[in-house]
């Protein structure tokens, strides 16, 4: 039985965490509080430890095979989002960005365009460009929403006009790489917004690939007026779309990565074109860990989500007290907070370096997230009350 009376976020001290050797705890000196990378300060969930321990005890450390991953995701998705994905359309792959890369290789060719909606997860840029694809930006609005006019202009640029233009030579292949829920802003796209995206994509012949890794971290059921997560493949018009899911973000399994890609009915053949070799690097222990998380993790995840809601409220209150010039972007998902510091630092000052030097807090540099990121910082809320309080109080030195 899992004790949910104490949030997983409040079980480890700073001394406990500094025993870790992951990038979060080794990238900076010990006098810096690391609040930059999306890694949580929680002990590993007992059901994950048990699943991995059982596998190790019997030597179940061979190659992965089958649909174990998707079979565990299906009932989880039914419980959390009232959605029943089709496990038979799935492909288990080493992690989300490997899955995205393999899908881009199938759907596009070098020189084709990938549309992104910045500010957005930085690897969307790196992986896309490493494959020789062009990045076309369709920035979110100042409120962090998808903008149909901006998207349509990006689709037109990406496709050379697309099927909607009727121009000779138009209709180059293109993909929209959608982050849903959105990192770093915490935006949860509404069903209506997703329907609009799919309608525009259909008109311009743009394929939609969604990274839905942050889906378990929406909190509409815990707050007033929040937006619930809508799986892309549950929306009309998603027949040719592909969505990628992983438990690694919600259950802190970045060191045991795995993912599953799911296809709409018209994209099944495309997903099957992903080479078999792409799945050879799937970590069988990771699949077992993720399957255990999806199967046994509801109570643990709910306690964690409640802690994130509490921490978001705490950070908002403390920032207003200690750094009132910093504006907090409202969020409905993820465990990240997007901070607008444009009025808090003098012109010409690098906010990331300024905070690191004066406050000894490492935050995510907004410039890494593409258009609209300059003058912003990303704060990780997935830590204890004590550490979060100390970090925000330190930020008061910088702002």
Name what the model sees in each region.
Residues 2-96, 102, 293-295:
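N-terminal small-domain helix-loop-helix segment of the aminotransferase-like
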Residues 57-199, 216-235:
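Conserved core of the PLP fold type I
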Residues 116, 137, 210, 363-365:
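Hydrophobic residues in well-ordered beta-strands that form the structural core
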Residues 131, 203-204, 239, 359:
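Helix C-cap/helix->beta junction micro-motif
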Residues 237-309, 399:
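Conserved core segment of the aminotransferase class I/II
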Residues 291, 308-316, 328-341:
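Conserved glycine-rich beta-strand-loop-beta hairpin in the small C-terminal domain of fold type I
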Residues 354-363, 369-399:
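PLP-dependent enzyme catalytic core of the Aspartate aminotransferase-like
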């Amino acid at each position: 039985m899992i004790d949910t009376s104490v949030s997983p976020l409040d079980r480890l001290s700073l001394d406990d965490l500094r025993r870790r050797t992951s990038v979060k705890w080794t990238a900076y000196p010990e006098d810096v509080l690391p609040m930059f990378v999306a890694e949580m300060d929680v002990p590993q969930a007992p059901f994950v430890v048990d699943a991995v321990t059982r596998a190790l005890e019997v030597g179940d450390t061979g190659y992965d095979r089958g649909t174990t991953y998707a079979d565990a995701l299906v009932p989880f998705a039914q419980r959390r989002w009232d959605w029943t994905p089709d496990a038979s359309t799935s492909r288990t792959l080493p992690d989300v960005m490997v899955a995205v890369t393999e899908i881009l290789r199938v759907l596009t060719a070098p020189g084709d365009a990938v549309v992104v909606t910045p500010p957005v997860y930085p690897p969307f840029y790196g992986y896309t460009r490493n494959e020789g694809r062009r990045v076309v930006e369709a920035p979110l609005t100042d409120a962090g929403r998808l903008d149909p006019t901006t998207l349509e202009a990006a689709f037109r640029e990406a496709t050379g006009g697309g099927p909607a233009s009727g121009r000779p030579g138009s209709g180059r292949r293109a993909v929209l790489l959608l982050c849903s829920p959105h990192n770093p802003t915490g935006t949860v796209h509404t069903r209506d917004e997703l329907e609009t995206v799919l309608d525009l994509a259909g008109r311009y012949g743009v394929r939609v690939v969604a990274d839905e890794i942050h889906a378990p971290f929406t909190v509409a059921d815990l707050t007033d007026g929040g937006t619930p997560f809508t799986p892309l493949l549950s929306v009309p018009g998603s027949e040719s779309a592909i969505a990628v899911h992983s438990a690694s973000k919600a259950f802190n399994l970045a060191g045991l990565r795995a993912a599953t890609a799911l296809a709409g009915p018209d994209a099944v053949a495309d997903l099957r074109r992903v080479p078999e070799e792409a799945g050879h690097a799937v970590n069988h222990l990771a699949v077992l860990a993720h399957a255990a998380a999806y199967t046994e993790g509801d109570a643990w995840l709910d306690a964690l989500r409640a802690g994130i809601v509490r921490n978001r409220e705490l950070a908002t209150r403390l920032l207003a007290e200690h750094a009132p010039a910093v504006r907090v972007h409202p969020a409905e998902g993820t465990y990240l907070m997007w901070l607008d510091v444009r009025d808090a630092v003098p012109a010409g000052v690098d906010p990331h370096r300024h905070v690191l030097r004066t406050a000894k807090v490492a935050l995510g540099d907004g410039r890494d997230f593409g258009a609209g990121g300059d003058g912003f910082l990303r704060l990780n809320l997935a830590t204890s009350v004590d550490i979060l309080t100390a970090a925000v109080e330190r930020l008061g030195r910088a702002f």
